[in-house]
Amino acid sequence: MSSTCSSPSAVEDPELGFRIDLDWTAGDSEDQVALRLESQLMVALPAPHDTVVVELKGIGDDDEGGLENVGLEMRVEKRREPLRAVTLMKAVGSGQQYDGVGVLTRLMRSDMMPAAIPAPAIDVASSCGVHWKTVTSLSLSGCGLLVMPVEVTELPLLEKLCLEHNKLSVLPPEIGKLKNLKILRVDNNMLISVPVELRQCVGLVELSLEHNKLVRPLLDFRAMAGLRILRLFGNPLEFLPEILPLHQLRHLSLVNIRIVSDENLRSVNVQIETENTSYFGASRHKLSAFSPLIFRSSSCHHPLLASTLVKIMQDEGNRSVIGKDENAVRQLISMITSDNQHVVEQACVALSSLARDVGVAMQLMKCDIMKPTETVLKSSSPDEVISVLQVVVTLAFVSDSVSQKMLTKDMLKALKSLCAHKNPEVQRQALLAVGNLAFCLENRRILITSESLRELLMRLIVTPEPRVNKAAARALAILGENEILRRSIKGRQVPKQGLRILTMDGGGMKGLATVQILKEIEKGSGKPIHELFDLICGTSTGGMLAIALGVKLMTLEQCEEIYKNLGKLVFAESVPKDNEAASWREKLDQLYKSSSQSFRVVIHGSKHSANEFERLLKEMCADEDGDLLIESAVKNVPKVFVVSTLVSVMPAQPFIFRNYQYPVGTPEMSYAFSDHSGGSTLTSSTASDQAGYYKQSAFMGSCKHQVWQAIRASSAAPYYLDDFSVDSYRWQDGAIVANNPTIFAIREAQLLWPDTKIDCLVSIGSGSVPTRVRKGGWRYLDTGQVLIESACSVERVEEALSTLLPMLPEIQYFRFNPVDDRCGMELDETDPAIWLKLEAAIEEFIQSNPQVFKNVCERLTLPFLNDEKWCDNLKPRFMNGKLPNSRVESSPSLGWRRNVLLMEAQHSPDSGRVKYHARALESFCSNNGIKLSSLHTTATPGCQKPSPGTAFPTPFTSPLITGSLPPSPLLFTPELGPQKFNRIDMVPPLSLDGGHVGKTVMSPPSSPPRQRQLYLPLRQMHEKLQNLPQVGILHLSLQNDSNGSILSWQNDVFVVAEPGDLADKFLQSVKVSILSVMQSNRRKAASVLSNICSISDLVRSKKCFQVGNIIHRYIGRQTLVMEDDQEIASFMFRRTVPSAHLTPDDIRWMVGAWRDRIIVFSGTFGPTQAVVKAFLDSGAKAVIGPSNEPQETPLITSQGSSEYNIGDQNGKFEIGEEEDEDEEVNEETEREEMEPPTPTSDWEDSDHEKTNRDGKYCGLWEDDEEEVSEFVCQLYDQLFRENSRVDVALQKALASHRKLRYTCHLPNV
């Protein structure tokens, strides 16, 4: 429509059917223009054609009012093709004064021709012409419309309406009449609102409102279930309509983002347009508008947006922006509790991406991500559980501080349950989470004390499902259960001769020399390198070899090929020599070669790009089973570590990248930064920081880095390659602190195998040059050169080892380091001719030292020869019989740690014995030159386990009161722990040792506590063991009861009245205790006990007796005469009762103290099975103790109150004589009155002890103590002098003492 007038024309358009061009001026009448257009249409459109019309009609009525017959009427009519689509366009260059809407509306009211559809199907009330009622598509784009014609809403079959590129500010509310509308496009207009009536268009499939001025559009999509496309791009939206009801939505555009996905939401394409900011305008991130829009409401819970977020977070910059938005983080967390499984899965993927950053991970913990996580972990849907577990796995890995916050009692319980899930992938993810949590040292201490978790992992490691047993083995490796892991994967045991260690120096391309020496060792031994050594380590190029040989199990030929690739790809010249910068670089290189290295390092920077080197390392270290160092520990490979230098701390520290975890209890130095008053310090995880405290702490290190990262960090030689950085940590070449890592290898061996000696130590250098006169140069630069040479020298370590190791003749030390001028090549040398010279020098070195290579090969193959001899000797012995028990053959013996620690309890009733086995042990060790340390646990008065409590008054108000048993069957006390107070031997004590009168009440301990503080006796033991690393045997001269080993004792008063149920049960407890101890002569015990029918008989027979481990001393008696003349006697006893125990939980928390040590018990009763298992689970070699376990004293059920009031009337209290002389006379008189039936009974055998004037001990079986003393001495003689295995030593010692019953408990194989 132009402003000039011309005759109308009609042409056939293949896309639009027929196109009609009509020009008119603004002054023309709209009616005239409409008539002209209508006439043009009549001419242009095809002529009418014959159409058969079929019409069905009812004929006649039946009795019920229905139609009886149907009539068929057929006729032929002239009709035109129905009108389907109309497009109104404004020609380019037309005037802007008129939009032609009036012409269109008049044209729509006209009825140009008969309708093509039956008249009843059309709304007769419509003002639209009949022919227009068949229109399904109408386009009014680019017409300059200011208002949408209302007549358009009268088209009943309209499905597509296009109104793009107009000037519409609003849409008419009548648009809701278009019930069949499927596509509505109103892009590039000026809309500021959308009519509410649009929600009546329930059939919409596409709604496009791009590039308008919508701020808060009121769009109600609840009835538009079929909407698939929603475009709101380019609108200044402040509020996103609720799109959750749009389940079919697959295309979405918002602000500056366009989103298109496939039907299943598996593939999502996201396009983000950046804003064009001016030079002076502040730049905004591309997500600055999108992020607050979708995270302001719950719309992000839509599946399409959830998938979009995953796509967006693949970009590191996008993750950073979203991670800083707390509201966005909280919305993502809320998405994991969605009812839509796809949303949960995508939210977990997004959160996992975010959690890789430490700062965002801390933000997630601050937003309480663990609460919904624990909720979803209880879901019945395995897919949802797997998705959430992936978040847990990522969070636990990213940071120790985050991991420590994650491990709660509920989380641990949930993970244990999921480890036993029926779905293998759920099991695998749960095991990965447990393993990642164990990277944190504090978490590892907690997890290792979980007995059920340990047993579960041991069970899962042998499951037939490969992915489950690999994950279980990984968890055991991270927990530091190296021995359990070795036995589970049937790994090779450390030879009996001792450890075999290989260390390799740094040297860049000179590592070719190391490879050549290793080839000679491999040739002479006939075994691959990884089978010859238990520990392999290296620095820089030596570290790369250590990884290649020990972790990747490569051949030496493959290692040689790696060096050639290294020279070709990494160290090749990349800058043309005629280039000016290259020329400048060469000049600086020449300056370096003239001994000005320090200047070179400062000015020149890195010579080679690390990108190609990293690519080569990633290709070499790729592993489908996991790329972490610790994940190689499950493959039955040697222990391997690589030395680097952590330069992001001051001073720089050695850093050990290792493929193993230290056993729990090993003092470690954490390299995690902690902020204190604006400064950064390193946190120490060592057991104590006291002055003078012995610390054999491990170096800083990690087993959670990727394998290629370890090599890259160790090889970051200054000038040659850039430093290697991960997060805030930065590493340089390990040669700065340990170019010869042999000292580090010895330290790591001591930490891994504390009771195993080193048999063979092989150190290989990369070649050195002879000492020569230094050429003159710049004075200060020469000083820097000297300092660098000294720091990287390998000879200082060699000199120290050559001096010290001869003092340890059992260690065979071999050092291979050729000294030749041909070994002086550059670290990045790429000239093959110089490589050949180096190889020639090494070959000459090998030929000149044949005997040394022969000796080292013989020493390394000695374990293999011993294994073959053992098998040969085994065959004839068991050819016709059963095979030997593997448990016996693997029985441990005393290692190189040969000191003894003797521990005795404070106030022990055994300390007063005339003959005591502890004194005999001290004499034996003194006479045989065995270093013995003693520990007497001390407990301050009122010593309690550290926990706050509330005081309550004691029930005892006077020492002259009758006793009763509280009705509570179980009460937790701070000193005795959980005690059954209805047991006769566990009455709450009235302390006579100066303790507090009031007790403190504490809650039962939670499991597991975050920080466990051992109380005084246990702290003393733990510190003593940490200070004495050479202790190989821990002798616990402690009594045992059902709660554990008794560390200290205290005195109290106990009162019992007779006659009464309490007295009967007390007397029964005494008899049962005596019978349990006198098992070897029950007939004598029965004859003695037959004469004791009451407490009166008991105290007449003995003033002092023992119930279990508790000593009772008779003090006195009070007689009370009741109104019916019945006498009630109240007997008062002084008891020596346990006040502190070494419980299984305590043993597990002190796990590092027992590792590789032999535990010996020598009390009356042996330890309980729980105590033994705790020791063995904590790494003890063996536990030896009496076979008879402490038995529970029969329980007493109080019927009502057992207390009896003491009155002054009719009461006479008799205090028993405590003077020594009177006691002797009194005992002699009582023996005359009541003579035991058998003179040789155990009662009489111990009578002489009761007359001891010291009055310290009233034991009953002194003869047994003398035999125990002899037995202990014989046991130690077998262990130390004969070097017998533990079980064999015990058998030989028991052979001479048939009465004693002792058992040796060994770890399960």
From Swiss-Prot:
Q: What is its main location?
A: plastid
UniProt lists compositionally biased (Polar residues) regions at 1188-1208
- Pfam families tied to this protein: Arm (PF00514), LRR_8 (PF13855), Patatin (PF01734)
Region (Disordered), start-end ranges? 1183-1253
- Say yes or no: keyword Chloroplast present: yes
Q: Where is the composition biased (Acidic residues)?
A: 1216-1235
* The keyword Isomerase appears for this protein: no
Instruction: Extract one GO BP annotation from the record.
Output: defense response to fungus
Q: Which residue numbers delimit the PNPLA domain?
A: 502-746
Source domain of life is: Eukaryota
Residue windows of the LRR repeats: 155-178, 180-201, 203-223, 224-248
> Which controlled-vocabulary keywords does the entry list?
Chloroplast, Hydrolase, Leucine-rich repeat, Lipid degradation, Lipid metabolism, Plant defense, Plastid, Repeat
Where does the record place the catalytic residues?
540, 733
What UniProt notes about the protein's domains is:
The nitrogen atoms of the two glycine residues in the GGXR motif define the oxyanion hole, and stabilize the oxyanion that forms during the nucleophilic attack by the catalytic serine during substrate cleavage.
Family that this chain belongs to: Belongs to the patatin family.
Q: What does this protein do?
A: Possesses non-specific lipolytic acyl hydrolase (LAH) activity. Catalyzes the hydrolysis of the galactolipids monogalactosyldiacylglycerol (MGDG) and digalactosyldiacylglycerol (DGDG), and less efficiently the phoshpolipids phosphatidylcholine (PC), phosphatidylethanolamine (PE), phosphatidylglycerol (PG), phosphatidylserine (PS) and phosphatidylinositol (PI). Hydrolyzes phospholipids at both the sn-1 and sn-2 positions. Involved in basal jasmonic acid production and promotes resistance to the necrotrophic fungal pathogen Botrytis cinerea.
Give the protein's recorded name: Phospholipase A I
